[in-house]
Each structure stands twice: as C-alpha cells, then as structure tokens.
Regions:
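ASCE RecA-like P-loop NTPase motor cores
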Residues: 1-421
Length: 421
C-alpha cells in the first residue's frame, strides 16, 4: 500500500509510541478514501473483496478469526497479541523460533528525560507517579523485576504533552527494568498463550524454553539433522567481535588500519562471494555490492544458492542477557561476572567474554548461536550446493574449521578477549 510520506511518518510515530488506537484511526481514514474511489473497474481487475473488508481483517482480526475455519497466516507479533480463548479453536503451527525472534530480543528503552517530563504532568495518577519515581531511583546497572504486570496506564493526552517518541505504554507494562546512565532499558513480559503450540525450528533450545515456561508441558520431537548440500568453512582464529575488530584496527600494523583494509584481507580467503554479513557499524566497509547486518537477517531469501561471507561473533549487550535472566529470577551483574573465560559449547572449548553462571551462559550461547545460524541460513545450504565462509570463533553447525592465523602479519593485541584456544 503506497502512503503519502506524512501519513507514513505519522503511522511510524504512533507505532513507536505504542499508540495503536490512533494508528488504527489513521488506517481507517485511508480505507474510507479507498472505498470512495472504487468503481466497477476495481472488481473487473480481479479484486475479490472491498478495501473495507480487507482493512477490517487487519484492524480487527478477532472478528474475522471468530467466524473463519480457514488457514490463517500471520506474524509472530500479531499471534502474541491475540487472546487465548480465540486461539484455542485453531491448530497453531509456529514457523521459526518465536522465543528468540519475537520475545527475548524485544528490549526497549525510555529516556530518563522523558520520564522526568511525565512526572511534571498534573494529570498523572498516584500509582503511575509512584511507579515512575521508583524506576528513576533504581541503582544504575542493577535489574529490577516487577511482580505485577499491566496495572498502570497513561492517558493519550499525557503522552502527547510529553512530546516523546518513547513507548511509554509498553514501558509501564514491562516485566524487568535496568537503569543506565541516560535511559532505562526494559523487557516486556515473556508469556505464551495457554493453548497447544507446535513450534518448528532448527535453533530451538528446549532447556531454554523450559526455563521460561516451567509450568508448561513440553514434548520434544527431535529430527535428525539433515546434512548440508553446501559447505560452511569457518576460520576461528579470531572472534571478530566488535571489540576484536576495533583492537586490530588500533594496533600498530598499518596493513589493517581501517575496517575496509581488514575486510579486504579476510575476503582473500574466500571465493565467488556474492554477499557479506557483519555488524551494522561496519557494513559499509565490506567491499561487496550486497551486504546485510546482524539483527536484520530474517526473511531474506534472495541469496539462496549464492556464496556468502560472515564476519563477526554477534554478541548482544550485557544488559539484554541480564534482563532476560532477571525474568527467571537469576541475578548476576556484568560488573563482577562478565569476563574473558574458557567456555564449552557442544563439545567445543574456546575463550570468550561470558558469565560464570551456567544458565546465563546458556542464554548467551542460545542468542549468539541463533543469530549466527540465521546468517548462515541466507544461502539455503540444505538445498543448494554453495559455500558460506564464517570468520568467528563461535562454532557453527556442520562447519569445517580452518585452524590457522589468517592475520599472522598483523600485530594483534594480546588482549583479544575472545581468541579461540
């Protein structure tokens, strides 16, 4: 649907603020304009339903789902927004790991200045004021878990007066919080609808699921891993984390004084590469026409059957690991625990920045592995005979390892925190 730039920007603003009612009103107005413009040629062109009917399915899916017996395809986010009572009438099949893709990584942020502006509003309820004051009083770097969810709401007028783009509605309904210097990070409650779910995923970790949903019954049907038709060639001499890349560039070896020079050297160990994946910060430095970055990979199918290169170990921010752990009552601060240590992952031993707590380690491995396998999956190796080159010390599935120092001419600092053993 083609939208006017102003309309598109307005919708984007409402969604970012969590103001979904206002967004629905804008979409309804667009629908009315379309409805007024249709004529006989509209249906002669092959259209099977009026714009108003199609829009109503999107805006009010509950009404449609109550009546239909058809197969319905929707996003993870839309599925998680629907009531359990409605979902129970369907056989639900979820494609991909919904816990990783749509729940654990949905961390949000609200600026301290925004919350201070909210406190200036005279219309603010006593409960909301007390909640915000308590959150502002949090010790920096320490997680806080709220025992009851969704009790407090702000009216639209208060949100508009604050002139903030932060999602205050979602913020006050969150489950766990961590104060940082100029903002408060938060993680929405991690909840599944109470009905039967069938989840199909190659990265699903049943232990992680049981940690977050201890009262649910899980039946795991493991399917033997299919051998890749293509190949994964992995170079584990360096983690190529953001910190490692930065340290290599800062070293005294002028051969790699810029990310572009470093990536050019790395690419010399590959062949016929069509696309590259690395961190968003360094994406423009990849000397390739086609690039992607970690965190923005799902659904990309245009590189099926193409050779690709992946540079980096996609570590997540420590506040995300700790917020996730807080939801299952595990408290461990990165200040004292997040260190360079020897770890064991699926029988492979190597060094990386990680936690002492084994459950926190497992959460960290789950997130990193899921993102790396998502990256490898862009070439569709199960059904195409091509090659993905991975430059990371975090082991990928079915990888053939090339154990040598491919930057041996570089004066890499000994403090490389994630170097493989």
């Amino acid at each position: 649907l083609m939208l006017e730039p102003d309309t598109k920007q307005t919708l984007k603003k409402y969604y970012e603020e969590g103001n979904f009612d206002e967004a629905r009103e804008v979409i309804s107005e667009i629908c009315m304009e379309l409805e007024a413009s249709i004529d006989e040629e509209f249906f002669l062109s092959g259209a099977t339903e009026r714009p108003s009917d199609a829009f109503n399915k999107y805006l009010h899916p509950e009404d449609y789902l109550e009546k239909t017996s058809k197969c319905v395809i929707m996003t993870h986010a839309r599925f998680l927004s629907l009531p359990t009572k409605l979902l129970k009438k369907f056989e639900i099949i979820i494609d991909e790991d919904i816990l990783y893709n749509s729940m654990l990584t949905r961390v949000g942020s609200v600026k301290i200045s925004t919350l201070e502006n909210v406190l200036k509003e005279s219309r603010l309820s006593y409960e909301a004021r007390l909640e915000i004051e308590n959150l502002l009083d949090l010790q920096e770097g320490k997680c806080y878990k709220k025992e009851t969810y969704g009790r407090i709401e702000l009216d639209i007028e208060t949100i508009e007066k604050c002139k903030a783009n932060d999602n205050l509605t979602e913020f006050l309904k969150a489950g766990c919080y961590m104060r940082q210097k100029d903002c408060i990070k938060y993680l929405p409650p991690i909840k599944f609808p109470k009905c039967k779910l069938i989840i199909l995923s190659a990265t699903l970790d049943n232990v992680i699921y049981e940690l977050f949903f201890p009262t649910r019954e899980f039946i795991l049907h493991e399917v033997k891993q299919a051998a890749y038709m293509g190949n994964v060639i992995q170079y584990p001499a360096y983690s190529m984390s953001r910190n490692t890349i930065k340290n290599i560039i800062k070293s005294n070896d002028l051969s790699y004084s810029t990310p572009a020079m470093l990536f050019k050297k790395i690419l010399s160990y590959t062949y016929n590469v069509t696309y590259g994946i690395t961190f968003k910060k360094y994406e423009k430095d990849l000397p390739l026409k086609n690039t992607l970055h970690f965190g923005n990979l799902a659904g990309t199918d245009c590189y099926s059957g193409k050779n690709g290169v992946i540079i980096g170990t996609p570590h997540f921010p420590t506040y995300l690991y700790e917020l996730i752990a807080c939801t299952i009552d595990i408290s461990e601060s990165s200040t004292n625990s997040y260190k360079n240590r020897r770890v064991n992952y699926k029988g492979d031993r190597f060094r990386m920045m990680s936690y002492k707590n084994e459950i926190l380690q497992r959460i960290q491995f789950y997130l990193i592995s899921s993102e790396l396998e998502q990256a490898v999956g862009r070439s569709r190796l199960l059904r195409t005979n091509n090659t993905v080159f991975v430059f990371s010390n975090f082991p990928c599935e079915q990888a053939d390892f090339c154990e040598f120092d491919y930057l041996k001419n570089a004066d890499v600092p000994k403090q490389d925190t994630d170097q493989r053993l």
